[in-house]
């Protein structure tokens, strides 16, 4: 049933009408605890981030464990103890319970809508401005880490998530070997806290040379899926800028 909850959530993110199909054709699931938790998707119109099954499992796993590889999740569900390299029944049960809670956190209406408000609030109002679902996956996992662990003030959560997402897109932080990069960042966050980790990453990657040379060179490319260009457009949306040669049409309207 948990597997179906993941599958149905992914399907409903794309096709809200599928809810009625589930109600009519899957009586067992319709009577489960998960059905009413998906009911809000009947009216969902979100298109910026439509997570697939792998994305849902990845986000659920990452914010519940200090790990990021889905292969590790498979091992844990098989009962593997990474320290002793033995297989234990209690690990299977504990992993399933944590994964279930993780999935419930991911599909929770308030969590998902508040996360999307943060992303949209940063200027990313369309899927046209998103070229890295991996960056969104980590940003959502980070959001869930912050709201569940409550390590930072609630009023700061969205700002931190926005900064992390923009930084990761601008620098291509998760463009290659994303699971290894996820694990590294989760480890740093657990060791130093998210605020200090973010400050260190900013200091290490967003230097004057980055802004004066790398960004300028990236903007010289003509590709419309260039990450730097997409962040530039999002910044214009954020600032409510007018489009070129227009006195009343905003960039937001044209995207």
Regions found by a protein language model. Give the residues of each.
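Intrinsically disordered, low-complexity N-proximal targeting/linker segments that flank membranes
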Residues: 169-254
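Solvent-exposed functional surfaces
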Residues: 1-203
């Amino acid at each position: 049933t948990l597997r179906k909850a993941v599958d149905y959530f992914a399907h409903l993110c794309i096709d809200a009408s599928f809810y009625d199909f589930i109600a009519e054709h899957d009586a067992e699931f319709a009577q489960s605890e998960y059905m009413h938790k998906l009911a809000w998707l009947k009216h969902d119109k979100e298109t910026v981030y439509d997570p697939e099954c792998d994305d849902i499992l990845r986000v659920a796993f990452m914010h519940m464990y200090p790990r990021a590889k889905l292969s590790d999740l498979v091992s844990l569900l098989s009962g593997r103890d990474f320290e002793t390299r033995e297989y234990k029944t209690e690990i299977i049960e504990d992993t399933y319970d944590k994964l279930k809670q993780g999935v419930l956190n991911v599909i929770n209406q308030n969590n998902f809508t508040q996360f999307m408000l943060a992303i949209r609030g940063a200027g990313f109002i369309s899927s046209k401005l998103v070229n890295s679902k991996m960056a969104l996956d980590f940003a959502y996992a980070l959001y869930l880490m912050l709201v569940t662990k409550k390590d930072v003030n609630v009023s700061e959560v969205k700002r931190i998530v926005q900064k992390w997402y923009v930084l990761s897109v601008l620098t291509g932080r998760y463009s290659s070997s994303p699971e290894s990069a996820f694990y590294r960042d989760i480890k740093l966050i657990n060791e130093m806290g998210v605020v200090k980790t973010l400050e260190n990453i900013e200091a290490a990657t967003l230097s004057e040379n980055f802004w004066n040379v790398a960004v300028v060179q990236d903007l010289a490319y003509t590709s419309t899926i260039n990450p730097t260009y997409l962040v530039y457009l999002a910044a214009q949306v954020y600032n409510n800028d007018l489009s070129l040669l227009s006195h009343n049409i905003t960039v937001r309207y044209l995207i």
